[in-house]
């Protein structure tokens, strides 16, 4: 067996040549993201083969990652924050005037925008939620694209509430009650009266009901529901009666709602661009399954899925529903993007984002199930290096964030980089992960630094018993909650992990919760407060401290690396500073990287390259993997 050559860090973590394509409403053009001055920007290109592409945004500070077509071919919108602070603003681009600068349509200091949606009822109008009036509250606005006029159509009645647009001028209000339940109400067009529709048990929804999409006829709302099921299904709430009925479900997979909400990667529901009718539903198990609930879309889906052995990812159509652009999720050949014309049957590849990466040199991501010590099944993924005997390998346990999230089958540059350096990579969907039923998620209540962590240790034991991993050469690495898990590995079980890498991770659970932005706190009731505790209650604060790595730094005996974004609004830099200062004060070496222009996760390519160059050196020194 021959291992592939070392692939450069730049090839893994540099910007893709093209990615994120979607088709225009009239079907004549595509937009996509591609580098301009080493930052991803939006480019426009006619669909005719051989046509010239044009860059229409000009951000050389931070990559543009989110853009929207509008129903007017003149305007395109995109969202951008500053240095990773997550305070996204809406910018307008004039596609008819290449010399015109982008215009910030929400120029309010300290505010952030989310839920930017094309109006169903008014041409040239988007709705958006923004906290410009009060940083703790999000009001709903109508935005006239051509003029930039903003009008409040739903003022927040208080923190923990949010309006969304219904049909025909109706508005829907979602709000957390004092008990943490989630209440949905309706305000009819032309009325100030808000009428209660239904209330959900908040304990079943760590992030609340993440999906509330009005039906095309305006009589109901589509939601992700676990009312009568362990697995999340698609249900409809009747806005007159509050009655809930199941619209679609899968016998063994969950509706892929919560993961997509965390990633902000779009709805699990697929709608007709012209009618707004539901046509498809995404479920996720080991791989994705899409249920077509419309006969015409079923034919489209059959032909589109035949283009790749990957899973259908980003999918867009023109208004006619005949022309489609689709990117595919894949473990070794990411986001290969095709054009498909359903009327003519024509299809062609538009691009591969990373043409310099040979899929044959990439490692296969294999689903495995590991049994925890108490018998709980742990759906996991194992990636083994190419061209290496899969025995007694150095291994990295890569822990996902959230923790109310899940790992899924797809290309991850960090995983492929580690595999190329000779490491086995194990990703465990430990208890608390979403996507496997509410019982799997709720098994994590009270188990931070407890069974959530022993699930990871059990994953190590499984990999050693299977012969894949060398017990003495196992590292733990992760971001956000995964960074917390890495610190728990370094402080609670230093005998298990030869090295730990914390990426924007929590070190002090109580301090983490105290430093959350005001607008986020009402949403913590069913996740952090329910699963971990309330730092305002002394007994619970003491328990949180006992489960925090900051309280056990004297137990750090193995090598530790920490990486932090200076502008992180979720896990503030002080979380990492405190760990580093205390360890260094007693003479313990810790590698510490701080990136001044990043937040909760790194975006700029040069920062990711710097970070993974340090990871490569750190792991090679302490686990013995390959390095340049």
Task: Give residue spans per PLM region.
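Sequence/structural signature of beta-propeller modules
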Residues: 1-3, 7
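Peripheral, non-catalytic segments that deliver or gate enzyme domains
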Residues: 13-19, 25, 29, 33-45, ...
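Hydrophobic/aromatic beta-strand patches that form the interior of the parallel beta-sheet core
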Residues: 127, 279, 368, 397, ...
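Short hydrophobic segments within beta-strands
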Residues: 224, 383, 398-399, 477, ...
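Residue-level signal for short, function-critical loop segments
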Residues: 284, 401-402, 480, 566
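Short beta-strand element of the alpha/beta-hydrolase
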Residues: 391-401
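A fold-wide structural signal in alpha/beta-hydrolase
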Residues: 395, 419-429, 591
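Active-site-proximal cap/loop segments of hydrolase catalytic domains
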Residues: 430-628
């Amino acid at each position: 067996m021959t291992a592939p050559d070392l692939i450069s860090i730049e090839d893994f973590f540099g910007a893709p040549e093209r990615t994120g394509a979607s088709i225009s409403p009239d079907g004549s053009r595509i937009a996509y993201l591609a580098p301009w001055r080493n930052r991803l920007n939006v480019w426009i290109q006619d669909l005719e083969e051989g046509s010239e592409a044009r860059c229409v945004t000009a951000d050389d500070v931070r990559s543009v990652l989110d853009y929207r077509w509008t129903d007017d071919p003149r305007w395109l919108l995109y969202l951008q924050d500053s240095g990773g602070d997550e305070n996204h603003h809406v910018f307008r681009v004039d596609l008819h005037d290449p010399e015109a600068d982008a215009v910030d349509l929400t120029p309010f200091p300290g505010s952030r925008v989310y839920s930017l949606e094309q109006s169903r009822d008014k041409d040239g109008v988007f709705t958006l939620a923004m906290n410009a009036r009060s940083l703790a509250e999000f009001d709903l606005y109508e935005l006239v694209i051509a003029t930039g006029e903003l009008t409040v159509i739903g003022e927040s009645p208080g923190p923990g509430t949010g309006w969304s647009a219904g049909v025909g001028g109706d508005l829907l209000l979602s709000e957390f009650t004092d008990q943490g339940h989630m209440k949905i109400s309706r305000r009819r067009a032309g009325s100030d009266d808000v009428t209660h529709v239904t209330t959900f048990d908040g304990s079943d929804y760590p992030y609340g009901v993440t999906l509330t999409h009005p039906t095309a006829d305006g009589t109901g709302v589509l939601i992700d529901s676990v009312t009568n099921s362990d697995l999340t299904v698609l249900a409809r709430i009747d806005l007159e009666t509050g009655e809930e009925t199941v619209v679609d479900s899968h016998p063994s997979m969950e509706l892929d709602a919560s993961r997509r909400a965390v990633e902000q990667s779009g709805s699990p529901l697929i709608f007709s661009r012209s009618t707004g009718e539901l046509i498809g539903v995404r479920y996720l198990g080991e791989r994705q399954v899409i249920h077509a609930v419309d006969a015409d879309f079923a034919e489209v889906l059959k032909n589109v899925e035949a283009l790749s052995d990957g899973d259908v990812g980003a999918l867009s159509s023109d208004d006619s529903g005949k022309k489609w652009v689709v990117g595919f999720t894949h473990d070794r050949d990411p986001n290969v993007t095709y054009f498909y014309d359903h009327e003519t049957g024509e299809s062609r590849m538009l691009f591969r984002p990373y043409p310099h990466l040979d899929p044959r040199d990439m490692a296969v991501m294999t689903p495995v199930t590991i049994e925890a010590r108490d018998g709980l099944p742990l759906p996991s993924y194992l990636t083994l290096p190419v061209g290496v005997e899969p025995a007694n390998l150095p291994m990295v346990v890569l822990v996902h964030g959230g923790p109310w999230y899940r790992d899924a089958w797809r290309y991850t540059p960090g995983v492929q980089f580690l595999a190329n350096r000779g490491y086995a990579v194990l990703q465990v969907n430990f208890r608390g992960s979403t996507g496997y039923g509410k019982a799997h998620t709720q098994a994590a209540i009270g188990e931070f630094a407890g069974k959530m962590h022993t699930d990871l240790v059990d994953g190590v034991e499984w990999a050693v018993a299977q012969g894949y991993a060398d017990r003495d050469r196992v590292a733990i690495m992760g971001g956000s909650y995964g960074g917390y898990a890495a610190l728990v590995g370094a402080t609670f079980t230093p005998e298990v992990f030869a090295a730990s890498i914390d990426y924007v991770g929590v070190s002090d659970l109580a301090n983490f919760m105290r430093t959350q932005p005001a607008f986020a706190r009402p949403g913590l009731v069913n996740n952090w407060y329910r699963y971990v505790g309330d730092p305002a209650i002394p007994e619970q604060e003491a328990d949180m401290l006992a489960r925090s790595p900051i309280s056990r730094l004297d137990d750090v005996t193995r090598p530790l690396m920490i990486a932090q974004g200076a502008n992180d609004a979720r896990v503030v830099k002080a979380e990492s500073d405190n760990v580093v200062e205390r360890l260094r004060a007693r003479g313990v070496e810790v590698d510490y990287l701080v990136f001044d222009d990043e937040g909760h996760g790194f975006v700029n390519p040069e920062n990711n390259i710097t970070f993974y160059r340090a990871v490569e050196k750190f792991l090679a020194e302490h686990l013995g993997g390959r390095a340049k």
